[in-house]
A protein has these predicted regions:
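A short alpha-helical cap/connector motif
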Residues: 1-101, 105-129, 133-291
């Protein structure tokens, strides 16, 4: 019988934190000076950026609907195109990436390349986060994305296995949060060329690797940890990257959201008024023709 996303190999509990809540925790506790995001979609995660954080976001087809910071620089291109044409550190005022979030193409080789490119612009105290590293089922972890799939995570989980094998200098964990886990990597080394030098060799080994690799010892092979706030915080740097009142920064972000909602409300009112006016004009013209 064909497996579906509902046929999970572990119970997906609604009590587990959602990944956006965990990202919000990272932002509010670490107060990053700089933030880079690969895979923007509707802007839900980019909207979590606090005032004062310089942000760069990359997506070939961003469809931003959320209130993202005005200072955020959004590049409508693939991540490969971006890193070939731009100096990320320069875009961040010559500062390293404090926090990076990878949620782009859900295929191993793309996610690994994104990791390599982001690490080059990090510092030793930076944090890289990778979405979709703890797939809920074999169907969700397929390299083929069927339109009927909901939370497709692809084979990004292989990046964790790869880092454990080839980059034992890193601290790698996967927080078991909804919907499909969040990889947390610290101890980064921007001077390392191990992954880039072995990229083709690594891809030959990992791209064809089957989900059955996780059949026994999935938690150990992916360094699973609980996704509760206390556990996640224990994996992050102990000090924030900058000073600031968390309450005031969150208030500033909330104000940005309120302005966005107000702007949408005004736009809807204007559109409604425009439609009513056009209906009245059409009705007046119809009456004139009947005279």
């Amino acid at each position: 019988m064909q497996q579906t996303l509902a046929d999970t190999d572990s119970a997906v509990s609604s009590s587990r934190p959602h990944y956006r809540r965990t990202l919000d925790l990272v932002h509010t506790r670490l107060l990053p000076r700089t933030y880079a995001e690969i895979g923007v979609a509707g802007g839900g995660t980019l909207s979590l950026v606090l005032p004062g954080t310089a942000a760069v976001a990359i997506d070939p087809k961003p469809r931003i609907r959320r209130p993202v910071p005005r200072s955020a620089k959004v590049f409508s291109m693939t991540s490969d195109e971006f890193f070939a044409a731009h100096d990320l550190r320069r875009l961040l005022d010559d500062r390293p990436v404090d926090v990076g979030f990878i949620d782009g193409m859900h295929l191993f080789e793309f996610a690994l390349r994104d990791f390599i490119n982001l690490e080059r612009h990090c510092g030793p105290d930076s944090v890289l986060l990778l979405h979709d590293c703890y797939p809920v089922s074999e169907a969700a972890a397929s390299r083929e994305h069927a339109e009927s799939m909901g939370n497709w995570s692809g084979d990004v989980w292989k990046v964790i296995a790869c880092l454990k094998e080839h980059r034992q200098d890193l601290d790698v964990s996967v927080a078991d949060i909804r919907p499909s886990g969040l990889g947390i990597v610290t101890g980064l080394d921007p001077t390392s060329t191990v992954l880039a030098d072995r990229f083709d060799e690594i891809c030959r080994r990992y791209v064809p690797l089957e989900y059955g690799f996780l059949a026994e010892g999935k938690e150990e092979k992916l360094n699973r940890v609980d996704g509760d706030p206390r556990t996640v915080l224990s994996l992050l740097p102990g000090r924030p990257y900058r000073r600031g009142s968390r309450a005031l920064l969150r208030a500033g972000r909330d104000a940005r959201r309120r302005r966005k909602r107000l702007a949408h409300r005004v736009m809807r009112i204007r559109r409604g008024a425009g439609r009513r006016l056009r209906r009245r004009v059409r009705e007046a013209r119809r009456r004139l023709r009947l005279r």
